[in-house]
Structures are given as structure tokens and as C-alpha cells.
Amino acid sequence: MARLIGVDLPRDKRLEVALTYIYGIGRTRATETLKATGISGDLRVHELTDDQLVALRDHIEANYHVEGDLRREVAADIRRKIEIGTYQGRRHRSGLPVRGQRTRTNARTRKGKRKAVAKKKAK
């Protein structure tokens, strides 16, 4: 396994796909990175030379926020919204969907498992 920015890339996958295992890099950024470094996306990870790995690492570190830095930025953005009391911050604090999705039905992932409600007693 080749290691790039603290992530083990799968050996047998195409480089274009393997780069998406890095948090913050999707298919578009992977393609841009390969084009900028002049490396073919059809190469497999185990076929890379050390020079190519260094070129990839240098380009990614110079141009993108990835992995731990990006995770910290996202967490800080959410914390900031909670602290200043925006609508989105209140939704984060309540554990409800943030972007306007309906909650009368659905939203089970965000709300968690259903809570049992007692039936009405018959008279």
C-alpha cells in the first residue's frame, strides 16, 4: 500500500479512484491533480514511482485542505454557527436536519431511533 498524506491508498485500484480515499479529494480534484502533475489516471497505485508519489503529495499539500486540517475546519465552522446562534447552529445542536429537509416523516438518520409512545387508554 502506498501512503499519501497519512492515508493508505489501495494498491490495485486506478490512481484516479484511489486518490478519492483521501478526505477532501473527490473525482474532480483527483483528475485535476493528475493533470497538473502529468501522471496518467490509468496507472495502478502499485505501479507508481517514488518521484510520482512525491509530486502528488507536494501538489495536494500546496493546493488543497485535506484530511485532518479539513476535518478541523468543518468542525470549527459548525462550532461557530452553534456559538453565534444561527438557525443552522440551532439545528446542529438539536440533532435535526440542517438544510431544510422535512422532519414530520423521514429524517430518521439524523433524529435517531424512534421513541415509543404509549397508546391512549380506553375508557
From Swiss-Prot:
Region of interest: Disordered: 89-123
Key words of the record: Ribonucleoprotein, Ribosomal protein, RNA-binding, rRNA-binding, tRNA-binding
Compositionally biased intervals (Basic residues): 101-123
PANTHER family on file: 30S RIBOSOMAL PROTEIN S13/40S RIBOSOMAL PROTEIN S18 (PTHR10871), SMALL RIBOSOMAL SUBUNIT PROTEIN US13M (PTHR10871:SF1)
GO cellular component, one term: small ribosomal subunit
Entry function: Located at the top of the head of the 30S subunit, it contacts several helices of the 16S rRNA. In the 70S ribosome it contacts the 23S rRNA (bridge B1a) and protein L5 of the 50S subunit (bridge B1b), connecting the 2 subunits; these bridges are implicated in subunit movement. Contacts the tRNAs in the A and P-sites.
Family per record: Belongs to the universal ribosomal protein uS13 family.
HAMAP family xrefs: Ribosomal_uS13
NCBIfam families attached to this UniProt entry: uS13_bact
Biological process, per Gene Ontology: translation
Keyword rRNA-binding included in the entry's annotation: yes
UniProt GO molecular function: rRNA binding; structural constituent of ribosome; tRNA binding
PROSITE patterns the UniProt entry points to: RIBOSOMAL_S13_1, RIBOSOMAL_S13_2
Official protein name in the record: Small ribosomal subunit protein uS13
InterPro entries reported in the protein's UniProt record: Rbsml_uS13_C, Ribosomal_uS13, Ribosomal_uS13-like_H2TH, Ribosomal_uS13_bac-type, Ribosomal_uS13_CS
Binding partners and assembly: Part of the 30S ribosomal subunit. Forms a loose heterodimer with protein S19. Forms two bridges to the 50S subunit in the 70S ribosome.
